[in-house]
Amino acid sequence: MNYSTKEFGDKGEEIAARYLEEKGFVIVERNYRCKVGEIDLIAKAVGLLIFCEVKSRYSLLFGQPAEAVDKKKIRHIRRTASWYLTQGMRIKHLYDDYDIRFDVLELIFTGGSKDNEIKINHIENAF
């Protein structure tokens, strides 16, 4: 099945969320947006909170998906994470005792539009 760009991104984020859940994480937020930016997934495990950028591609023709996470994108993600932790939380200081990590999840649909052929590369501490 061929997807629109938005559908493809949404599909990648759904697969990434399931992947993290299988690794023992609980998804706290999906597509968190605030006035300073957006984060694809926010997930937690015991003592760890991760802010995760998801990048999906049909091929590596234009490079690795994570290469699209440039300095500007990193700056926006960090600002958004800071906002989330200090301003956007309904319960402030909820994650004060958690380690914070920034990850990138690369999803490469190696079978083209076939959903059953997906390579996932989880880059922990990506930045």
Q: Would you name each region that the model predicts?
A:
Residues 1-30:
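Acidic-basic catalytic patches of nuclease active cores, encompassing PD-(D/E)XK
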Residues 3, 7, 11, 36, ...:
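Residues at secondary-structure transition points
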Residues 26-49:
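Active-site metal-binding core of divalent-cation-utilizing nuclease and nuclease-like domains
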Residues 36, 49-51, 99, 120:
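Structural motif
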Residues 40-42, 55-57, 105-108, 126:
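Anionic group-transfer/hydrolysis microenvironments
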Residues 41-61, 65, 77:
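Conserved catalytic cores of phosphodiester-cleaving nucleases, focusing on short active-site segments
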Residues 67-96:
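Mid-chain, well-packed structural core segment of small domains
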Residues 88-127:
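Domain-level recognition of nuclease-like catalytic cores that cleave nucleotide substrates
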